[in-house]
Amino acid sequence: MLLCVSADLAQAQGLDVIHCTDSTFCVPSVWGMPRSKALIFEYENVFSHRLRATSDLEAVGNGSGELQREERLDFKLRFPIYLSESFKMALGFSYFNEDYIFKDFDNPDYALFQSLDDKNLKSMGMALYLTKAWKGKHYFIMRISTDLNGDYKAGVLPRDRYLRVSIAPMFGVKKDAWTSYGGGIAWGYNFGRPTIYPFFVYNRTFNDKLGIESILPANAMLRVNFSQSMILYSGVALEGSSYTIRPSGEALAQFETLQLRKSEIRLFANLEREIHDWFWFNVEAGVRFSYRFELAENLLYNPETIIDMRRRPAPFLKAGVFLVPPKKFLE
């Protein structure tokens, strides 16, 4: 799950609104950042690439083959539940579906192939977003999320072994209308395994066309504002997740459940275009580099792997639509 602690929950665009003074409450976003997304629907396809799997377990062994494609469907909804000048609270819901399609495996009975091929991996989650602003230049943002990640079937209530919890609190400083920075400590799955790590946020707008937005080590992006209705992002992102799956085949029969841990680095370009005020679409393309892709015993923290996989870089294409607050709501 990607670290997300960005921006105010109802971002404004005018300099008179987002400039922080000693007598006004700080707004974390900087000039040029787009309105926050209230609803997102995206489809992604990672194209064919080779994969090699190794295991120290003699019963599992090694294998290689081709991942014909990875299909991903993503739905997110976020809405405010409390708004005031100094404190904002929002609630978010998400659904994510990921499907791996293998072909040309050197051993069709290989444990990895049996456990992952054409098996829908789902993530259903809920997140709470808190933003506290003080008069002047300081603010606090926190995101708490819980997700149920795994290969559970629709209509079946998942057990607690599918539960994933992430938290990311941060303090920030709004230097002026063009610059905002801050930092915090996160607990999450950006590296595939559950990890506690520091992060740093830096947002800067240089002029009416160019800016940067970054949450290190999660992402760093260059923003090009062609107009108020078209924005181009390009940069690098670190994405990760963890799924609980039920193993298939005799080689892994000793394990009740396994944990698929994945983390990847992405180089991308993303174009966002307004269709009508609150209705936008986006198209994203890039290259995915696998950092971690492994099966391990389903424990909270377990550095040992059962199957370690190496994937070659692969191109990906993503398209979607999203809704933002109408401009009149921010006036």
Positions of the model-derived regions?
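Transmembrane beta-strands of outer-membrane beta-barrel pores
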Residues: 43-49, 93-101, 146-152, 185-191, ...
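Sec-dependent signal peptide cleavage junction
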Residues: 8-47, 51-58, 327-331
